[in-house]
């Protein structure tokens, strides 16, 4: 690549030796050449003698002598340059440096290697460091140097992001560039690093193709034989003019290589101009702007001052001055290229002045910003010094204590009224001693201070006064919640035990039930009834153990877990802590939080709970933990074993109506800014709302619908449509839309093969129909395809599929026992479907329902109408118990069922139900399927009785 390290100004006091002398002088008379001879007016001389006397560095820090300009005296060979004068070091270690001998730069040199650079073009009379990595271009440049043709054309690429040394098309570069001489070349093996000096502007005429290197020896022999002749200065100039012909090039053809290596160029001459008043004014303004930039930005001061002190000809030469002005700026590449391409000197001066003005404004902005930053730093430093002096003065006068003393006093003041265990006090004393030895600004100081802050914020031995009055606690619970008798009874039992013992102990309760039944809200009421502080945190989706047990102090930003945060916030050792959604706890790479809860919720272990951050035992035995969950299946068994499970079941319509009238409607009126006179909802409307819109187990959706009705009522009142709003069953749809539930159940009259079952989900109980039908007609007479089959659909889980297979096997055996001549289930291909296929279903409690549906299809008789059943059936017909009896009973009553069949072992669960739930239900408890068969098919029993009588 042609990488640039920036401009090296001609007159700058830079480190490179080439900057210690002018490389180009435009004189008005004769000047001495490098060899000591005199040149005529207008001749250009490139002085490339080295300050170390013609020696270049070799490997190991040595220098190799390539030429000795002073030993040649006034001979004419000095200006020729040749292979002997520009040699390449071939021995020694390290990079090889080639320093080229002084030579006269030819006025015309049409064929040049092309070097494409980025960002900053090379201006005439300026130096640039260029690196080349392209192999073909590297070989070409080496060949040119060996032939004493150290000249290149440097052109700017149009795309600054292009990092390549060469281009594939001339369209990728600007066609106006600079004719440059390779002043020094350092061969690094895979790349060349060169110092090039710009001499004049050139323009690309066409692309050339490089001939193979095989033609080179002949050219070199001609060159060597030509060098042996001693010629005059004119002959030397002729020879240099003929040198370009030594490298054979041809015009590029259409099938040439993609890379452009050689081009034919022509010199670009500027337009003639007169030194008018306008030109003088522009040059004076440029010089003034440069001096202003020097005054603002010290980076330009040394180089530009030396440049302008070298001679007044710099100021008097508008051509050089315009190039120098543009080169000093950090303008965009296309702006610098525009200056390079401009041939009108007046316009070039204007463009250079414009770029210098922009640079001047930028320098002023930089100076202003630097001054503001420096002033701010001075003020901050002054304020710091004054504060430190004030601290020392106050300390000497006894008005203020040291920071460390104040911190220690604050921490000890916190612990005065607390009963701190001895092992904790030892840790506090040790940390305070360590804090006194630490520097205030060290990171360890802040870590220790934060640790002591947490350690002294724990309410060691401090407890809130509990309410042990049963009557008051019961009134608080009844005031906030309707129903939930099991929960209220358990809380009152806890108060009674505490009253008899004279002290309280912590307990771990778990409320599980459908969403929206009040599990979370009852916990706050319990805290109010007991007089305890309340703290809630949710573990749903938690995957990090550190959320519960804290982080180690070694981590940045470490802090204790939720339990220690709870103690600090509540300021008591006996708060009520609600751990919400314990059935939805996660597991990740940071450990298993459910395992961390084992120590927290174990009454035998939480008296010495160890947080990772505090690293001292904390007593949690007096904390009342209440957990909530929707289902218990996802709670790990060890964790479930440590908790006292209390079922919070869903509500029936009567309970929902009471909750709505007592709690939901008054709360919604308050939120909407209405009173009872402006918006009226009758019990009939609420019943219709519950029946047609809110059939779920909880009351959360009912609360949303009530708020929706009252919001629309408020809108009508504010908009002036009505003064008061009366919601009736007739206009209810105007407030909440079309009814969601229009029918009570799928089948009002069940046909043969269809039986109603009862299901239990996380949302509560529901009715579930099981349908059976023939997939194909029964085989007639032929013995082929005699064995029947059963296909099951309805998105059933693995357990329910196994239950269906068991029911199918038992139904075939039971039918053969009851009616040996009926082989319907043996030979038929039956399809069993559970409707609502989009809803996943699983569980064994549909076994009795499936057997009844298969027998109903085989017998061609419908089951008893308004009959629902639940229970798991074994392979021998025994009916096994199931769960969710309350939810299933509520769902059956909601669907208008009058007869329910339950397993005999669930009698105790049914007996616990409230009378208003079981009222109007005929319940049968069965132990074997024969009992179900007699209840479900009463007509068949009657027919069999008649047959026996006959």
From Swiss-Prot:
GO terms for cellular component: cytosol; mitochondrial matrix; mitochondrial nucleoid; mitochondrion; nucleoplasm. This is Lon protease homolog, mitochondrial. Residues 112-360 form the Lon N-terminal domain. ATP-dependent serine protease that mediates the selective degradation of misfolded, unassembled or oxidatively damaged polypeptides as well as certain short-lived regulatory proteins in the mitochondrial matrix. Endogenous substrates include mitochondrial steroidogenic acute regulatory (StAR) protein, DELE1, helicase Twinkle (TWNK) and the large ribosomal subunit protein MRPL32/bL32m. MRPL32/bL32m is protected from degradation by LONP1 when it is bound to a nucleic acid (RNA), but TWNK is not. May also have a chaperone function in the assembly of inner membrane protein complexes. The gene is Lonp1. Residues 1-65 form a transit peptide. Residues 749-939 form the Lon proteolytic domain. One of its GO terms (molecular function) is insulin receptor substrate binding. It catalyses: Hydrolysis of proteins in presence of ATP. One of its GO terms (biological process) is proteolysis. ATP binds at residues 513-520. It is found in: Mitochondrion matrix. It holds the Pfam family Lon_lid. Residues 67-94, 212-243 are annotated as: Disordered. Residues 224-233 have a biased composition (Basic residues). It comes from Rattus norvegicus. InterPro entries: AAA+_ATPase, ATPase_AAA_core, Lon_bac/euk-typ, Lon_lid, Lon_proteolytic, Lon_Prtase, Lon_prtase_N, Lon_prtase_N_sf. It comes from the Eukaryota. Keywords: ATP-binding, DNA-binding, Hydrolase, Mitochondrion, Nucleotide-binding, Protease, Serine protease, Transit peptide. The active site is at 845, 888. Its main location: mitochondrion. The keyword Signal does not apply.
């Amino acid at each position: 690549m042609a990488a640039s390290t920036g401009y090296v100004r001609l007159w700058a006091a830079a480190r490179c030796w080439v900057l210690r002398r002018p490389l180009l002088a435009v004189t008005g008379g004769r000047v001495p050449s490098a060899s000591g001879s005199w040149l005529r007016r207008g001749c250009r001389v490139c002085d490339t003698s080295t300050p170390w006397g013609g020696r270049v560095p070799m490997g190991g820090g040595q220098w190799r002598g390539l030429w000795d300009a002073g030993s040649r005296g006034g001979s004419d060979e000095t200006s020729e340059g040749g292979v002997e004068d520009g040699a390449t070091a071939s021995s020694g270690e390290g990079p090889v440096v080639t320093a080229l001998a002084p030579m006269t730069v030819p006025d015309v040199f049409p064929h040049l290697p092309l070097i494409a650079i980025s960002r900053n073009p090379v201006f005439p009379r300026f130096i640039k460091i260029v690196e080349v990595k392209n192999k073909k271009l590297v070989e070409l440049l080496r060949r040119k140097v060996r032939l004493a043709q150290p000249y290149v054309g440097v052109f700017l690429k149009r795309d600054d992001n292009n990092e390549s040394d060469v281009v594939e098309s001339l369209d990728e570069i600007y066609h106006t560039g600079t004719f440059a001489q390779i002043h020094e070349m350092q061969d690094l093996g895979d790349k060349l690093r060169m110092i090039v000096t710009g001499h004049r502007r050139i323009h690309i005429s066409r692309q050339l193709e490089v001939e193979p290197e095989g033609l080179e020896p002949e050219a070199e022999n001609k060159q060597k034989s030509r060098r042996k002749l001693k010629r005059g200065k004119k002959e030397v100039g002729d020879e240099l003019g003929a040198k370009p012909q030594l490298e054979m090039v041809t015009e590029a053809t259409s099938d040439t290589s993609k890379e452009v290596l050689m081009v034919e160029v022509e010199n670009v001459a500027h337009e003639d101009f007169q030194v008018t008043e306008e030109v003088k004014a522009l040059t004076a303004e440029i010089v003034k702007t440069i001096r202003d930039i020097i005054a603002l930005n010290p980076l330009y001061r040394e180089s530009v001052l030396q440049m302008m002190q070298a001679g007044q000809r710099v100021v008097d030469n508008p051509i050089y001055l315009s190039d120098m002005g543009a080169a000093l700026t950090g303008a965009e590449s296309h702006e610098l290229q525009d200056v390079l391409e401009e041939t009108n000197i007046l316009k070039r001066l204007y463009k250079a002045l414009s770029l210098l003005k922009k640079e001047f404004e930028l320098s002023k902005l930089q100076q202003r910003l630097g001054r503001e930053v420096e002033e701010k730093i001075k003020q901050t430093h002054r304020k710091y010094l004054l504060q430190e002096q004030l601290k020392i003065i106050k300390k000497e006068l006894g008005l203020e204590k040291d920071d460390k003393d104040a911190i220690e006093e604050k921490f000890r003041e916190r612990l005065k009224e607390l009963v701190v265990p001895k092992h904790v006090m030892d840790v506090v004393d040790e940390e305070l001693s360590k804090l006194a030895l630490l520097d205030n600004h060290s990171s360890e100081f802040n870590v220790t201070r934060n640790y002591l802050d947490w350690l002294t914020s724990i309410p060691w031995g401090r407890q809130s006064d509990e309410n042990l009055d049963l009557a008051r606690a019961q009134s608080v619970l009844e005031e906030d919640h309707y129903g939930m008798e099991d929960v209220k009874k358990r809380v009152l039992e806890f108060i009674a035990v505490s009253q008899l013992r004279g002290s309280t102990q912590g307990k771990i309760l778990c409320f599980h039930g459908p969403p929206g039944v009040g599990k979370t809200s009852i916990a706050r009421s319990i805290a109010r009834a007991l007089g305890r502080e309340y703290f809630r945190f949710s573990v749903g989706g938690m995957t990090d153990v550190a959320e519960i047990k804290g982080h180690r102090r070694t981590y940045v930003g470490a802090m204790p877990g939720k339990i220690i945060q709870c103690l600090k916030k509540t300021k008591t050792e006996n708060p009520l802590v609600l751990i919400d959604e314990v059935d939805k706890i996660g597991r990740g790479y940071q450990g298993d939080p459910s395992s961390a809860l084992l120590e927290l919720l174990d009454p035998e272990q939480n008296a010495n709970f160890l947080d990772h951050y505090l690293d001292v035992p904390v007593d949690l035995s007096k904390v009342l933990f209440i957990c909530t969950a929707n289902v218990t299946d996802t709670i790990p068994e060890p964790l479930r074993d440590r908790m006292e499970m209390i079922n919070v079941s869903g509500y029936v319509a009567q309970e929902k109506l009471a909750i709505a009238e007592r709690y939901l409607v008054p709360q919604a009126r308050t939120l909407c800014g209405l009173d009872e006179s402006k918006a009226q909802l009758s019990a009939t409307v609420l019943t219709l709302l519950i029946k047609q819109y809110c059939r779920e187990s909880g009351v959360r959706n009912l609360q949303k619908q009530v708020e929706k009705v009252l919001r629309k009522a408020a809108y009508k009142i504010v908009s002036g449509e009505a003064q008061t709003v009366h919601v009736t069953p007739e206009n209810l749809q105007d407030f909440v839309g079309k009814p969601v539930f229009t029918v009570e159940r799928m089948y009002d009259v069940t046909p043969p093969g269809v039986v109603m079952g009862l299901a239990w989900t996380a949302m509560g109980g529901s009715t579930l129909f099981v349908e059976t039908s023939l997939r194909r007609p029964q085989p007639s007479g032929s013995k082929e395809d005699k064995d029947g089959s059963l296909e099951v659909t309805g998105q059933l889980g693995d357990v329910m599929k196994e239950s269906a297979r068991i029911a199918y096997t038992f139904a075939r055996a039971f039918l053969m026992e009851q009616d040996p001549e009926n082989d319907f289930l043996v030979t038929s291909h039956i399809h069993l479907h559970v409707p609502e296929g989009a809803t996943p279903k699983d569980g064994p409690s549909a076994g009795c329902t499936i057997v009844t549906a298969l027998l109903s299809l085989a017998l061609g008789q419908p089951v008893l109408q308004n009959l629902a059943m639940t229970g798991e059936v074994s392979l021998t017909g025994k009916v096994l118990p199931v769960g969710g009896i309350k939810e299933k009973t509520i769902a059956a009553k909601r669907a208008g069922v009058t007869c329910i069949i339950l397993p005999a072992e669930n009698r105790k669960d049914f007996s616990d139900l409230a009378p208003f739930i079981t009222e109007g239900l005929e319940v049968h408890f069965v132990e074997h399927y024969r009992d179900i068969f007699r209840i479900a098919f009463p007509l068949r029993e009657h027919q069999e009785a008649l047959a026996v009588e006959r």
